[in-house]
Amino acid sequence: MTAQIIDGKAIAQSIRTKLSEKVTARKEAGQRVPGLAVILVGADPASQVYVGSKRKACEEVGFISRSYDLETNCTEDELLNLIDSLNDDPTIDGILVQLPLPAHIEDSKVIERIRPDKDVDGFHPYNVGRLAQRIPVLRSCTPMGIMTLIKSTGVDTYGLDAVVVGASNIVGRPMTLELLLAGCTTTTCHRFTKNLEQKIRQADLVVVAVGKPGFIPGEWIKPGAIVIDVGINRLDNGTLVGDVQYEAAAQNASFITPVPGGVGPMTIASLLENTLYAAEQYHD
């Protein structure tokens, strides 16, 4: 068996095209164009790349894109005051603060300062809680994008045994909630997990988000399983690879996401979907 590739790049482009059409329809109906504010603190190269991609995608679909680049040594209060002003700005539907933040700024304080109805990253405790209660509104972008990828396979998720490797607040934990909502029996693995191989060998669906190149051997993958690889790791030779050993995994899986071109584009597409959702549901 050779796995079918889940083409995140193509699916994300399809979503962006639909969003662009919706923005055009809003304009023609005399409605406001959605607005997204993106805040970058410092000059971390990876963060600059991510932020640049988000701003470009925003403009591609016709959203208003506002950029705020703050110095690494900006104070926590300066950042919180900027968020307060954007919370009160009626032209802004979504506020995104690129993580990680410098050590002197507390992530949780910043995330909780963003109004829940403008939290298009889906990180605010209110929005995570809504997902936990099975009534999601603004959902965490990467898990939301992954659910779109899984849906594209046509596989019925109800009753599947799913394993999530990684328990971060950004991916692993909300991913577990998304899979529960989709009817999976879900196991979340982390650094204290015993018998990881055994758990993965039994899984119908595997989502890996640990940030370690080739962490999961491909031969662990159960024949016919769906493999979602969230990792994006740059090797010394410049090659980008995922957290799963791709070639071997593709021999066992029924569907697999490539790296790059799998989950990454979907995270940004989901961010744009959340921004339009916020405009329509909360701010029109």
Curated annotation (Swiss-Prot):
Catalytic reaction(s) noted: (6R)-5,10-methylene-5,6,7,8-tetrahydrofolate + NADP(+) = (6R)-5,10-methenyltetrahydrofolate + NADPH; (6R)-5,10-methenyltetrahydrofolate + H2O = (6R)-10-formyltetrahydrofolate + H(+)
Keyword Ribosomal protein among record annotations: no
EC number(s) on file: 1.5.1.5, 3.5.4.9
Pathway: One-carbon metabolism; tetrahydrofolate interconversion
PROSITE patterns given in the database record: THF_DHG_CYH_1, THF_DHG_CYH_2
Record: residues binding NADP(+): 166-168, 232
Sections of the chain in a coiled coil: none
Any matching Pfam family: THF_DHG_CYH
A GO term from the CC aspect: cytosol
GO terms of biological process kind: L-histidine biosynthetic process; methionine biosynthetic process; purine nucleotide biosynthetic process; tetrahydrofolate interconversion
Keywords for the protein's UniProt record, in alphabetical order: Amino-acid biosynthesis, Histidine biosynthesis, Hydrolase, Methionine biosynthesis, Multifunctional enzyme, NADP, One-carbon metabolism, Oxidoreductase, Purine biosynthesis
InterPro entries, A to Z: Aminoacid_DH-like_N_sf, NAD(P)-bd_dom_sf, THF_DH/CycHdrlase, THF_DH/CycHdrlase_cat_dom, THF_DH/CycHdrlase_CS, THF_DH/CycHdrlase_NAD-bd_dom
Recorded GO MF terms: methenyltetrahydrofolate cyclohydrolase activity; methylenetetrahydrofolate dehydrogenase (NADP+) activity
Protein task: Catalyzes the oxidation of 5,10-methylenetetrahydrofolate to 5,10-methenyltetrahydrofolate and then the hydrolysis of 5,10-methenyltetrahydrofolate to 10-formyltetrahydrofolate.
Record-stated family: Belongs to the tetrahydrofolate dehydrogenase/cyclohydrolase family.
Subunit structure, as described in the record: Homodimer.
This protein's name: Bifunctional protein FolD
Organism: Shewanella putrefaciens (strain CN-32 / ATCC BAA-453)
Lineage of producing organism: Bacteria, Pseudomonadati, Pseudomonadota, Gammaproteobacteria, Alteromonadales
